[in-house]
């Protein structure tokens, strides 16, 4: 069982790398491209803010991903690994082809798919999924209105 736990940690770290590879570039591209910040400063600032963010703004999104997609009592380490692997594969493929991608959406889809494959549709938390999908729809509309 220790080997499986270590494997899950390694897969989570790979997902984190893929997430940083994609999302960090999105967040710093403008300030680097316009020469407001040097690349080293932009990446350093991004790293610091990604670390500080959960302490300042909380972990509500992470809690929803952890408990609001699949029934938390039924999740196994294999579902976690499967969800992360699906998100890694999809994010890597889209990044390779230059397609716009949200790793958060990839993670939700990966966990949802692994949960359905391993436990069935009845173990999905539809209230949590409604919240997630509402955010996916509302956020771009809000950005369009405000921006």
Task: Identify the residue ranges that each predicted region occupies.
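Alpha-helical transmembrane segments and immediately membrane-proximal extracytoplasmic
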Residues: 1-147
């Amino acid at each position: 069982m220790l080997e499986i736990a270590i494997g899950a940690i390694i897969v989570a770290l790979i997902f984190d790398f893929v997430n940083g590879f994609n999302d960090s570039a999105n967040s710093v591209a403008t300030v680097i491209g316009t020469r407001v910040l040097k690349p080293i400063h932009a990446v350093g600032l991004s790293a610091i803010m990604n670390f500080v963010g959960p302490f300042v703004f909380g972990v509500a999104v992470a809690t929803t991903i952890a408990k609001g997609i699949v029934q938390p009592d039924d999740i196994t380490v294999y579902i976690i690994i499967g969800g992360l692997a699906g998100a890694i594969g999809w994010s890597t493929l889209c990044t390779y082809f230059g397609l716009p991608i949200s790793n958060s959406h990839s993670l939700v889809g990966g966990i949802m798919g692994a949960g359905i494959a391993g436990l069935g549709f009845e173990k999905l938390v539809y209230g949590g999924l409604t919240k997630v999908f509402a955010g996916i729809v509302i956020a771009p509309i809000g950005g369009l209105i405000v921006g």
